[in-house]
């Protein structure tokens, strides 16, 4: 195998080099990113960290700011200006028809405005494979900014144009942007990162979702943009992250795995590895991908139906479906329904509640950052299983405190603690790890179809919660949280028995971990079992 590795390395023109990266790439912005390698922190013993590079940081931050940040922002941005938007709907209707809008019609229009974001997300998920096959990961993210910018302009100009339809259409287009972003960004980050930091880099998606939610809450304050005269600007600022991504990502290469396995462009793949890893000698990394490339070269991208039928990924698919369903059905969205009433019962003046609500966004962000810092130490399993388990426990506690909140003045404060604990539990694991696992469970040819399945479950579950929760809440009142507690506990139990730890494992090793449960082996393992089996058996 060593002789084989050397032959492949020479074929690619790779020779052992020193740490000097001055000749690793052409001059220009890309080289500047590579040369900032000296900013990375050192490790004991004088050894330098090889995991993080400035290019990885720029790719993750710029990618997430223009993608998952916008998803989180659009989840919360409609809350503060709700009364002003409804008034705008009524004024537009009265100007056209000569009479005020019927309350039921207004409720329907507002429900469509909120829920159509999820419909757009589903559409975006379904077109990912088609766009990604042609454009690749990076250029799909860049093209996706066209959806964000057009949606921002439509929504920001709706008041001036007197057309509420522009706001609804803009929300739909913004949903398409979110559907594409939540599929392509985790794929891109998973494929450009070394396995040692794949989880931490993947959590950037969740961190920026939380930052986006918090930013939407913050800008919605009356002192900022949450006023009747300025609410359209809440949607106009969506342009800023999109433009930042458009100006930064072009200087970075596409996923090296995509370039090598799907485009078969070895030279560009080598340069991409050099840029993202911040070193010139990437022969080992290229050889790891070539091991997959030797069998993947003749394998086309599988379809969603083929992936669902494949016995050798059956439990990976089931696990992705379970985690994504629990991600949306775990009840976090329902928490926002009770937040204002609970804060009010705790004695907080109504005018101050929007400011106190910022604490929920702050807790989300801190918990997501904590998860990103510890995920490579604790692993995926403890954070995901523990997160769902704690959510189930705190939902049960919240049900008790909400039932007894009129019996003592201090009980509502326990409810506030319960809400914050649920949010922290969600963001410390379930809020981001499902996206990471979807990227880790599948080989290159399967990954786009896997993200279509995951995204479809995600957006359909999102839509179902928005549609069904009002009826569940009306029927069960505060006991509705017991439904979410059951979902969380059930998900935790399933993951405890099925989910293997993927921390610091290659894609081949993760596939092997599922093989016994699947009772079937993927074709590449049969063809090149010496590669994968050798690595598995070599693990301590």
UniProtKB/Swiss-Prot annotation:
Effect of residue 350 to L: No effect on urate transport activity; no effect on urate transport; no effect on protein expression; no effect on glucose transport
Source species, domain of life: Eukaryota
UniProt KW Nucleotide-binding keyword: no
CDD domains documented for this protein: MFS_GLUT_Class2
Effect in UniProt of substituting residue 488 to L: No effect on fructose transport. Highly reduced urate transport
Reported impact of residue 169 to M: No effect on urate transport activity
Keyword S-adenosyl-L-methionine: no
Gene3D superfamilies listed in its UniProt record: MFS general substrate transporter like domains
Residue intervals annotated with topology Cytoplasmic: 1-51, 129-140, 193-200, 253-316, 376-381, 437-451, 500-540
Keywords: Cell membrane, Disease variant, Glycoprotein, Membrane, Phosphoprotein, Transmembrane, Transmembrane helix
Gene Ontology CC terms: apical plasma membrane; basolateral plasma membrane; membrane; plasma membrane
Record field: transmembrane: 52-72, 108-128, 141-161, 172-192, 201-221, 232-252, 317-337, 355-375, 382-402, 416-436, 452-472, 479-499
Outcome when changing residue 281 to H: No effect on urate transport activity
Positions glycosylated per UniProt: 90
PROSITE patterns the record matches: MFS, SUGAR_TRANSPORT_1, SUGAR_TRANSPORT_2
Record PTM Phosphoserine, positions in chain: 9, 515
GO biological process, alphabetically ordered: D-glucose import; D-glucose transmembrane transport; dehydroascorbic acid transport; fructose transmembrane transport; hexose transmembrane transport; urate metabolic process; urate transport
Consequence the record notes for mutating residue 125 to M: In RHUC2; markedly reduced urate transport activity; decreased protein expression; decreased urate uptake; no effect on glucose transport
Chain positions covered by the region annotation Disordered: 1-31, 519-540
Stretches in topological domain Extracellular: 73-107, 162-171, 222-231, 338-354, 403-415, 473-478
Illness association: Hypouricemia renal 2: A disorder characterized by impaired uric acid reabsorption at the apical membrane of proximal renal tubule cells, and high urinary urate excretion. Patients often appear asymptomatic, but may be subject to exercise-induced acute renal failure, chronic renal dysfunction and nephrolithiasis.
Protein name per Swiss-Prot or TrEMBL: Solute carrier family 2, facilitated glucose transporter member 9
Organism annotation: Homo sapiens (Human)
Gene that produces this protein: SLC2A9
